[in-house]
Amino acid sequence: TALMGDDFTNSGLFMFVADKAADLSAGNLYVAKISQTSAKGGPAAASDFSIKWIHLGHATSAEIEALANTVVPTDIMDVKYTDPNDTSYKKIGYDGANNWVKLAPNSKLPADKLTQAAAFLETHRYAALQGASMAFTKMEGTTVNIKDKIAYSAMSRIEKSMTTDEYDVKVAQLKSGAVYAHELKGGQVDNNGKAINSEWVSTRMYVPEGLAGEDIAKDALGNTSNIDKISCPDNLKFSEKMRTLFIGEDSGYHVNNYLWAYNVDTKKLARILSTPAGAESTGLHAVDEVNGYTYIMSNFQHPGDMTFVPAVETAVRPLINQNFKDGYSAAVGYLAFKA
């Protein structure tokens, strides 16, 4: 089972369930239908959703490769960017704008191949056409806590399509973002009442205690997110041995981006690494128990890539230019913990 979102406005939560374990060459694709159980317009930190799944289609890698090599977008979907005043089109949100869409009426593809191509090659628009909740903004990394059957998704910024009620989700804007947890269960069915062949299906999505950022007025250093909380979470990795979720930031709201460690038992959040000003904390990986150690791989890129307040610009820019080749170099490293 593969669970993922994508870095998009009006993105969905998608799930792929392979026909055979450890073989992703064939399977079923699903998209989430969200029901908000928390207060509409309430704080993102308290947001809570139940999830059902819409079946989009089944395919093999060979089938999709063959389609990709033979069709063009207009063979799949008829898309208008202004209202055609035609009820055969459905209005959808797509990357922050309105589209009016329907399956291509004069496609060269037979009906079964048309819907398959739409599901796997025009996934966003087809998911919206099928009634999915295309609400999410900036959904980034996903990881899993196997023991507790909890997955985690980074919502780098909570804004735009998540703050209206057009797409089944309405929470207060939180540019600092949050990490959402997914409760994973078996015994689920799709919108057609057909069993989903997985024990790892998300049925609930919520923000755990301590995993929401906080927007603030700009401080003296230029931070617009509280530096003692996460901001724009991006990379996520979970260490089963340490019972810890590691969170890397890609934020323009912290002058220095951080790598955080969140213990899922104590709910304690700790900052364990700071990158140079303007750099992104990325390349995150957790490797449990190698020769008695757990390793956290991490790197940073594009140091100095932000507009600093004057005092920081004067103090920091020369150091970035001197130490990181005018901002064009990066560094890769690791932290080691005794297992």
Name each model-derived stretch.
Residues T1-A339:
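Sequence/structural signature of beta-propeller domains
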